[in-house]
Amino acid sequence: MRTLWIMAVLLVGVEGHLMQFETLIMKVAGRSGVWYYGSYGCFCGAGGQGRPQDASDRCCFVHDCCYGKVNGCDPKKDFYTYSEENGAIVCGGDDPCKKEICECDKDAAICFRDNKDTYDNKYWFFPAKNCQEESEPC
């Protein structure tokens, strides 16, 4: 029951473009980003510190770094445009900043897909106390 409540809170907290990120993860990786990566390892979900625990957690670390390089728009709230061409996600639109957000999300979704086999349930709702090591630079 506690897990369902936490997932409901995570879903309510998803704003603007973060729902687009969820959609991209579903399209590319074939699984729910909120469910699988909403609170995984040291970097998936809110915040992020320490060292990535596995390749899936590293996808989130790289995604956080990518968002950190975006200037001129809000990666968590602004909407972007994309299309699907021959099964591939193609980021579009006239706004280079929003296109950057899309590229960050697309790369993370591909990373999740390519690292599904590294996903380990022991990192789901991983305690923050286990993420105290110094973070590596982006």
UniProtKB/Swiss-Prot annotation:
Chief localization: secreted
**Subcellular compartments:** Secreted
Q: Which GO terms describe its cellular component?
A: extracellular region
Give the first-level EC class, as a single word: hydrolase
**Which residues carry out catalysis?**
H63, D105
Look up the EC number in the record and give it.
3.1.1.4
Pfam families attached to this UniProt entry: Phospholip_A2_1
Give this protein's Gene Ontology molecular function annotations. calcium ion binding; calcium-dependent phospholipase A2 activity; phospholipid binding
Free-text cofactor note: Binds 1 Ca(2+) ion.
Q: Which residues bind Ca(2+)?
A: F43, G45, G47, D64
Q: Which UniProt keywords apply?
A: Calcium, Disulfide bond, Hydrolase, Lipid degradation, Lipid metabolism, Metal-binding, Secreted, Signal
Q: Which CDD domains match?
A: PLA2c
Cofactor(s) the protein needs: Ca(2+)
Q: Where is the signal peptide?
A: 1-16
* Catalysed transformations (reactions): a 1,2-diacyl-sn-glycero-3-phosphocholine + H2O = a 1-acyl-sn-glycero-3-phosphocholine + a fatty acid + H(+)
Q: What is one process in the GO biological process aspect for this record?
A: lipid catabolic process
Q: Which cysteines are joined by disulfide bonds?
A: C42-C131, C44-C60, C59-C111, C65-C138, C66-C104, C73-C97, C91-C102
InterPro entries cross-referenced by the UniProt entry: PLipase_A2 (IPR001211), PLipase_A2_Asp_AS (IPR033112), PLipase_A2_dom (IPR016090), PLipase_A2_dom_sf (IPR036444), PLipase_A2_His_AS (IPR033113)
- Where, by tissue, is this protein expressed? Expressed by the venom gland.
Q: Tell me which family the UniProt entry assigns to this protein.
A: Belongs to the phospholipase A2 family. Group II subfamily. D49 sub-subfamily.
Per the entry, what this protein does is: Snake venom phospholipase A2 (PLA2) that has high lipolytic activity. PLA2 catalyzes the calcium-dependent hydrolysis of the 2-acyl groups in 3-sn-phosphoglycerides.
What name appears for this protein in its UniProt entry?
Acidic phospholipase A2 1
According to the entry, what is the taxonomic lineage of the organism? Eukaryota, Metazoa, Chordata, Craniata, Vertebrata
